[in-house]
Amino acid sequence: MSNTPYNSSVPSIASMTQSSVSRSPNMHTATTPGANTSSNSPPLHMSSDSSKIKRKRNRIPLSCTICRKRKVKCDKLRPHCQQCTKTGVAHLCHYMEQTWAEEAEKELLKDNELKKLRERVKSLEKTLSKVHSSPSSNSLKSYNTPESSNLFMGSDEHTTLVNANTGSASSASHMHQQQQQQQQQEQQQDFSRSANANANSSSLSISNKYDNDELDLTKDFDLLHIKSNGTIHLGATHWLSIMKGDPYLKLLWGHIFAMREKLNEWYYQKNSYSKLKSSKCPINHAQAPPSAAAAATRKCPVDHSAFSSGMVAPKEETPLPRKCPVDHTMFSSGMIPPREDTSSQKRCPVDHTMYSAGMMPPKDETPSPFSTKAMIDHNKHTMNPPQSKCPVDHRNYMKDYPSDMANSSSNPASRCPIDHSSMKNTAALPASTHNTIPHHQPQSGSHARSHPAQSRKHDSYMTESEVLATLCEMLPPKRVIALFIEKFFKHLYPAIPILDEQNFKNHVNQMLSLSSMNPTVNNFGMSMPSSSTLENQPITQINLPKLSDSCNLGILIIILRLTWLSIPSNSCEVDLGEESGSFLVPNESSNMSASALTSMAKEESLLLKHETPVEALELCQKYLIKFDELSSISNNNVNLTTVQFAIFYNFYMKSASNDLTTLTNTNNTGMANPGHDSESHQILLSNITQMAFSCGLHRDPDNFPQLNATIPATSQDVSNNGSKKANPSTNPTLNNNMSAATTNSSSRSGSADSRSGSNPVNKKENQVSIERFKHTWRKIWYYIVSMDVNQSLSLGSPRLLRNLRDFSDTKLPSASRIDYVRDIKELIIVKNFTLFFQIDLCIIAVLNHILNVSLARSVRKFELDSLINLLKNLTYGTENVNDVVSSLINKGLLPTSEGGSVDSNNDEIYGLPKLPDILNHGQHNQNLYADGRNTSSSDIDKKLDLPHESTTRALFFSKHMTIRMLLYLLNYILFTHYEPMGSEDPGTNILAKEYAQEALNFAMDGYRNCMIFFNNIRNTNSLFDYMNVILSYPCLDIGHRSLQFIVCLILRAKCGPLTGMRESSIITNGTSSGFNSSVEDEDVKVKQESSDELKKDDFMKDVNLDSGDSLAEILMSRMLLFQKLTKQLSKKYNYAIRMNKSTGFFVSLLDTPSKKSDSKSGGSSFMLGNWKHPKVSNMSGFLAGDKDQLQKCPVYQDALGFVSPTGANEGSAPMQGMSLQGSTARMGGTQLPPIRSYKPITYTSSNLRRMNETGEAEAKRRRFNDGYIDNNSNNDIPRGISPKPSNGLSSVQPLLSSFSMNQLNGGTIPTVPSLTNITSQMGALPSLDRITTNQINLPDPSRDEAFDNSIKQMTPMTSAFMNANTTIPSSTLNGNMNMNGAGTANTDTSANGSALSTLTSPQGSDLASNSATQYKPDLEDFLMQNSNFNGLMINPSSLVEVVGGYNDPNNLGRNDAVDFLPVDNVEIDGLVDFYRADFPIWE
């Protein structure tokens, strides 16, 4: 026993085992007859009936669990025996705790605790000396935080504790030698880590120089999403935070938003002038036959006299420009009187407010001329009225009819032309599903049955019997249910291990009577049919004997649904082309026999035929469980089973997000995927946490001895099965969760013994049931803790369960006294709980420094470096997870109150395996948890066939992705902090490049792992078998985060250095280097050569920042491949739609313009006069939002909030940003700090931009940029310089048809300017505040001859866009316009003659002599000027498609603004409606 690696006190404990078993007074054992000496031998007369009842000892075995399972001899070595080591399962070597050894274990725990305290004291002393030796005095401020003060106070207490116990632990000399050895080892490790992190001694000194630099993460990476119904906070770990933290993305978004605003203005003016020239009724009469339309008795009910000639009616009386749902040809002479006879009938009888509520009439349907049925087919619309209300305003329709006609049912004039019966049958579902059951739409290829519940209408309330009868029809046959449950516990259970398998299966047997089918019990304890002929035996009755069985039924439905979705055949088919072979991982199908593969294929084909509809879960949670009431109102019926159902419900909502439109009752139209970023999950998790507190899960069950006393009562209650009334003296939680297990054990011991509490066998079974219940208790609590950490990491929100050990003493599931010899997979679950909790502690340490305001406000560089090094050691396998957690605690990065010291006796052999070992496990047949020892082939043959091993390895794979995503985030934060400092401190350039390279490496690693996952999910028996639904969103989210950093680097590689917002414009007007023919030819040739090199590119290799000019092309190829992936995944996963649109947006935006596309029409390819609005399905529509939506967008606020005010730098270009008036009004009068000019880390001497090649391009500049003549000053002002505004007004002013109320404060009203002033500042970008609801009634411009001549002399584009950027100089504020009582302006034509007689065309009268080809349209010049983003030539044609335009007013009508968020638009095939009041109306 001397060669054992375990502690020296263990052999003494093991040696006293056999001698102490029989005489220890503390052992709860019962010796069998004949086991003692002859003096204790039983009498001879006990040989008949009494000898049948044998008493078994409650002896805890000494051998490990694995050896007893394999039935081999165990050498009982600690921490793992030799047999387990040879077999390759040393990580599972587990010994049951001896009850008499608790005192000895406590002594061991004390020694281990003292050892950890000594290590922590030394680490704190080292940190304190480092701080004192630092020359910076500001670094000491960060130690004045409450946590740091408690840390040092704790160190003094620990030092006192160590000094008090040192003499009892060991001698002083031995302690001194041990400390010296540990100090030497730590110094060597620190030196090696520093050497690996820095290439030479100079870089090491540079790193040490900036170690105490402080970073403020509370301002750079915090977002607030302002929605129409509230706000959502998005922290530094959210995927949108990178858009705020990166300066290049911030400037790009500002440029894009400005472009979008300009383009929308052009769209509006074009549509306004098209209405101005065509004086038509807003009601489309094209559907009526010509003969019927010409009849005098069938005139339009709209009063055309309300309109001025050629003008659109006022908004409050004008129906929105859509097709009128009333067929105007169907009215006979007795229905609608002619307009001449009835002067009071001046309004359309259709209530057009219904349009704003969401009803869209059909576009192509032609109704019958004289039909009285509905002209609206509600079944063809995706947007129906929210209530069954007729769109015809009956008050306006029937007010002129006599009473006898109105009451006559035979008179056709008394009937509404809308068929109300069809409206009742096709009424839209309300936002809340309290009245109807949503209809199930099975996916393509589904073999789901047609259930009556999907075709019938349900009342507002269904009785329990009706719900159960409907569920019986929805559930699959009995044998299929048993197969689904078996598949779940074999493949999916490790992802959500909060159930007791035996207990749950017994509950299912009781509810569905699966044991009545001549069952044969399989290895899992589930009753299975003995013949395949019973395959189609349906569920005829559902028994719910207890209240908690409703929750068990809900869990069963989630399991059936989730398992069906997770079948490999249901996964999305991904074809990446030639790159697919790079992302393949070996599978284990070669190790399976042909018969096993055939049997597996038959089972999957059987399961595919039986899909459980999502409506079954809705019925159960709404009518049986009443989950909304339980989670929000009352906790009377909350028990352990209720918490389990809530966790399963939350898990299902995140995994199967496509069903959220049916399951959720909240309206999340503003989010593309309400299943992951929505705040509804935050509320649900908070409810789960509070229910756990209500049940007492935060306290360990060993603290409550009364749990042991409830078993006899529970057993008796279950034996008398059939009544829902529970014993009032029985704990309801135990009654609901342990009854089935007790019933099963009691039935095996006989009915007489089950009613007898004196039976020792029954006592033992009861004890086992108690331990299994406590085990489930602990598993649920730590799973909630893990959910809290994952949500905080995903959304960047603070954790709910902070400082866990301050209020919870629940032990890990490994503390449960359970014999796992019959359930090895539960042993793996227990090991995973311990490992995953330790990984969560590492994540908590990172989240504390990023999200906690007290730490994130002044976090230091060396703290982030320590976190990076420890996480790298963990994911690369160079350090055990126990050592990593200990290092975090010793360095003060993780407080002990988070639970770091909860596992002092953890298995060091069970750690996170290396990622290559996980992926290559099937190919090389390597030991996944090898401890470095070589194993022979004979040992491999003896290896135990472990259950759900592939699922466990898939979970390990996801943990690696999470850790490496944190490493990417930490390096990115440091990179963005030090990159702008390079211009002031050149020493930071080395640090910035190192952090950028590390961030790129981890970003590419996440990108590759995402591709590996989706490229292997359909492979049979692969690593990700049955994990396609559970891991799809986490993998795709990490891939999406990686692409954001790729975009940042592409911008740096193409744009070059930033010049700084306060120094000069980042948008150079008129730069045409990208349109020079010779330059274009050279760019095309370089692009072709680089594309040939990319064909040979290996996507599995890392990308080097020193790749030069090919860096952007290499990264672009990654983006294209990811776009291809998300496009294929969009067919199955809704959240892939948002990511596909985001990727497609940047791909289109950063695409290099080619010469062919620019010269197709002789240099006029950007002439968009005939250009039509593209289809939404072919463009990125997420930027199509109105003013209110844009101002709520966090990226918009951050992108445009830092722009310097106009006039601060007169040399700045007018395209640079918004005016002072608009900017300060939006941002509350505050300005974000300016962005400093600096060179990016990708900038090299060979990467110079061709910004100086402007000689020839300047000569070709259009005369639009030469200058303009100001009538007020008669001075030529260069086009690139904005005139200084007078009277404090900005050079950018509101449009002609609307003006800001800030200009009315002085009592002056602007007059109508001339066209010279209208076009004088066409290049200036107006702010969003120019769009107001104030309207000005102007005379009809079509009546003015000069105005008409100027229109004729312009191109269609010019006439449509000439008033897009109207400037109202202060000289025009002379009060020539008066406001009438209605709030509209009337032009005083008597004072100035004709108000529009002085209007001239742009550039004065010279325009009349110029042709349309000599003068380019405004939009073209605008796009040409703004296609240059800091040297990056953005393709204007793709920019129009990417940014999107002003939506056609004919499609307007909804007044509920969709919450705007970039790349978040649900309606990919429908137009996003604007709020009509935000755009002016021309009259």
Curated annotation (Swiss-Prot):
Cellular compartments per GO CC: nucleus
UniProt-recorded Gene Ontology molecular function terms: DNA-binding transcription activator activity, RNA polymerase II-specific; RNA polymerase II cis-regulatory region sequence-specific DNA binding; zinc ion binding
Sequence ranges of the HRM repeats: 280-285, 299-304, 323-328, 347-352, 389-394, 415-420, 1192-1197
Pfam families to which the protein is assigned, alphabetical: Zn_clus
Residue numbers binding Zn(2+) 1: C64, C67, C74, C81
Cysteine pairings via disulfide bonds: none
Polar residues bias: start-end ranges: 1-50, 143-152, 160-176, 432-447, 706-734, 1388-1411
Keywords for the protein's UniProt record, in alphabetical order: Activator, Coiled coil, DNA-binding, Heme, Iron, Metal-binding, Nucleus, Repeat, Transcription, Transcription regulation, Zinc
Coiled coil residues, start to end: 105-134
Location of the region described as Disordered in the Swiss-Prot/TrEMBL record: 1-56, 126-208, 432-458, 706-767, 1384-1411
Residue ranges, annotated region (Heme-responsive): 244-444
DNA-binding region: 64-93
InterPro entries per the UniProt record, alphabetical: bZIP_sf, Fungal_TF_Env_Response, Transcription_factor_dom_fun, Zn2-C6_fun-type_DNA-bd_sf, Zn2Cys6_DnaBD
Gene3D superfamilies reported for this sequence: 1.20.5.170, Zn(2)-C6 fungal-type DNA-binding domain
GO biological process: DNA-templated transcription
Top-rank lineage group of the source organism: Eukaryota
Annotated residues for binding of Zn(2+) 2: C64, C81, C84, C93
Compositional bias per record (Low complexity), positions renumbered to this chain: 130-142, 177-208, 735-759
Subcellular location: Nucleus
Main subcellular location of this protein, as a coarse class: nucleus
Assembly, per entry: Binds DNA as a homodimer. Interacts with SRO9 and YDJ1. In the absence of heme, binds to at least four cellular proteins, including YDJ1 and SRO9, forming a high-molecular-weight complex (HMC) which results in repression of its activity and dictates its DNA-binding specificity.
Note: Heme is an effector molecule for CYP1/HAP1. The HRM repeat region mediates heme induction by masking the DNA-binding domain in the absence of inducer.
Function of the protein: Regulation of oxygen dependent gene expression. It modulates the expression of Iso-1 (CYP1) and Iso-2 (CYP3) cytochrome c. In response to heme, promotes transcription of genes encoding functions required for respiration, controlling oxidative damage and repression of anaerobic genes. Binds to the sequence 5'-CGGNNNTNNCGG-3'. Is non-functional in terms of iso-1 cytochrome c expression in strain S288c and its derivatives.
UniProt protein name: Heme-responsive zinc finger transcription factor HAP1
